[in-house]
């Protein structure tokens, strides 16, 4: 899980999701997991 000020899709499988007021990127590739913070 990377914590970034700007979360971007890193590949076609990445999805940008909002959960509990946080912006997350979920992906089948574990290295692409990000959250905004």
Swiss-Prot record:
InterPro entries according to UniProt: Ribosomal_bL36 (IPR000473), Ribosomal_bL36_sp (IPR035977)
Family: Belongs to the bacterial ribosomal protein bL36 family.
Record's keyword annotation contains Zinc: yes
Gene Ontology terms: cellular component: cytoplasm; ribonucleoprotein complex; ribosome
Record keywords: Metal-binding, Ribonucleoprotein, Ribosomal protein, RNA-binding, rRNA-binding, Zinc
Coiled-coil region list: none
NCBIfam families in alphabetical order: rpmJ_bact
Cofactor note: Binds 1 zinc ion per subunit.
Biological source species: Deinococcus radiodurans (strain ATCC 13939 / DSM 20539 / JCM 16871 / CCUG 27074 / LMG 4051 / NBRC 15346 / NCIMB 9279 / VKM B-1422 / R1)
Protein name: Large ribosomal subunit protein bL36
Cofactor or coenzyme needed: Zn(2+)
